């Protein structure tokens, strides 16, 4: 399960050998696709819902996973920042709110959610390898033949172009390394709004070892253990993450803001710009290196 904007995406995948490599000449790819589709359209449930015992186990495991995030302080700090920054948006749904909803799931409500997904979810099938496109389409239609008429749609994500004020949250925890996370509205109206310019800007600012945050905050001034920036495209938010000693907090903030002003004033070098473009292009080219990478792009 992954999050894209204010929507969740469920990904199911299966890997098998090519049919030409089987001993008996049977179609492994076709059988694998049928198995994958059956997991989606024919789960272990009846008219009364999913198995209470299996559901109870999944609720417990999911709750444990949510509650354990605090053990990963970097991830926890990121989550708390987004919860605070997007407090009035679906994107800012808190860990406790999610946990409360998870514990309320029943066999019947889960069955209803599954049916809703089949009726309204956008289904995308990526098949990589020596497999017939027509065969894939045929098996997909057969798998959904009992679903009836579908009305697929994806709810729109709210993009906030500019923050009205500054919100700050500090939590005291026992740990060796403090975490500083900053969130900025990227001025985007949707996920495609001048995306590539913003992608390069974020990369020059804090995307790699050539970036201004890495070269100055970490290397030149030695104010942190790490300092990086990334763009959450699906929500239009630029996030800066840094591991610091708490006594250096203000110094780190001042230097990050100084580097941001340099970016805003266009005072970065042509070398920085070209290094960023090369790194991003190389990353996009690498998507073709493996079947898995191709299937998820």
Positions of predicted regions on the chain:
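M16 family metallopeptidases and their MPP-like homologs
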Residues: 1-42, 75-97, 122-128, 182, ...
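Short, surface-exposed recognition loops or helix-turn segments adjacent to catalytic cores
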Residues: 48-59, 76-82, 97-98, 152-166
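Active/ligand-binding-proximal structured segments within catalytic/core domains
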Residues: 1, 182, 192-206, 215-217
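Hydrophobic alpha-helical hairpins/lids featuring a short glycine-rich hinge
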Residues: 26-27, 36-49, 59-67
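Short, low-order "capping/linker" segments at domain edges
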Residues: 64-68, 167-175, 282-289
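An aromatic/glycine/proline-enriched structural segment found at the starts
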Residues: 91, 101, 116-119, 124-189
């Amino acid at each position: 399960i992954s999050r894209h904007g204010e929507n969740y995406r469920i990904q199911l995948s299966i890997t098998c050998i090519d049919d030409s490599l089987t001993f008996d000449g049977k179609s492994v790819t076709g059988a694998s696709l049928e198995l994958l589709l059956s997991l989606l359209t024919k789960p272990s449930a009846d008219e009364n819902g999913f198995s209470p015992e299996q559901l109870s186990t999944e609720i417990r495991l999911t709750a444990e996973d949510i509650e354990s995030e605090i053990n990963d302080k970097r991830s926890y700090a990121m989550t708390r920042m987004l919860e605070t920054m997007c407090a009035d948006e679906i994107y800012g749904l808190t860990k406790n709110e999610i946990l409360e909803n998870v514990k309320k799931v029943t066999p019947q409500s889960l069955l209803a959610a599954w049916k809703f997904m089949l009726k309204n979810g956008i289904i995308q099938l990526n098949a990589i390898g020596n497999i017939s496109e027509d065969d894939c389409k045929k098996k997909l239609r057969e798998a959904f033949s009992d679903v009836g008429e579908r009305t697929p749609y994806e709810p729109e994500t709210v993009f906030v172009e500019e923050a009205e004020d500054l919100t700050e949250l500090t939590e005291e925890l026992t740990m060796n390394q403090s975490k500083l996370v900053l969130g900025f509205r990227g001025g985007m109206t949707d996920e495609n709004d001048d995306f590539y310019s913003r992608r390069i800007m974020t990369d020059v600012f804090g995307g790699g070892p050539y970036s201004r945050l890495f070269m100055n905050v970490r290397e030149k001034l030695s104010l942190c253990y790490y300092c990086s920036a990334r763009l959450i495209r699906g929500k239009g938010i630029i996030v800066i993450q840094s591991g610091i000693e708490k006594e250096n907090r203000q110094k780190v903030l001042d230097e990050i803001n100084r580097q941001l002003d340099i970016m805003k004033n266009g005072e970065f070098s042509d070398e920085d710009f070209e290094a960023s473009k090369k790194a991003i292009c190389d990353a996009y080219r690498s998507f073709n290196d493996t079947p898995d990478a191709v299937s998820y792009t």
